[in-house]
Amino acid sequence: VSERPVYLYCDGARTELRDASALWGKDAIETEEALLAEGGPGSRVACIGPAGEKLSLIAGISNDSGRMAARSGLGAVMGSKRLKAVVLNGKRRIGVHDRAAMKRLSQKCNRWVQFQPPLFTGPMSPYVGAMMRIMPTQMAMDGLLYKFFIRKWGTVSMNQVSIEMGDSPIKNWKGSNVDFGPARSRSVNPDAFIDRERVKYHCYSCPLGCGGKCSMTGKYTETHKPEYETVLALGGLCL
């Protein structure tokens, strides 16, 4: 454990721990902005905010202005070491055995991801979930099928689907879709979030682009589009 707050800096030529005392106490966005300005063009930052510093067991690691590695309290692991951030700024090109073949495969993948037929609409969500609930056997689904939903709405695409199929924490997992039926769960339909979404964005090198920024009124003018678990943790879980 470091005696003082530090961050790890690596640019390919050197790897070193640098003092982060001035950053300790800052939130993740403030920290990332400060380290990007210091690291220069091409830098990437993963960092924690006050929750991670205080070893909160729900603290995540933030990157790309608020995208979170949020499972299992990873932010608390960094905080326990007094590691405020990791900053990478590599310049070395990554070698590929067959660059032309890699390019073709990447382009093929991108075309598939960006192909978005109008197969599914927001109001269909509860019916799809109910259909999955009453099926006598569950079928394994190709993960690529989910890209239609994730690309359009993000993870909130599964809100009403998961409620109706029984895969949502209603009443802290003691309840069911009977307690939070379509009439009530309409407030978490994915279209409710798209109505506020003003711009989409991608995490670094991701062709899917499930992220979005939503407009708000009040003290703050915008926020990240919420994720499925956040919405339902503050919804059906609290019943």
Stretch-by-stretch model annotation:
Residues V1-L239:
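Intrinsically disordered, low-complexity segments enriched in small residues
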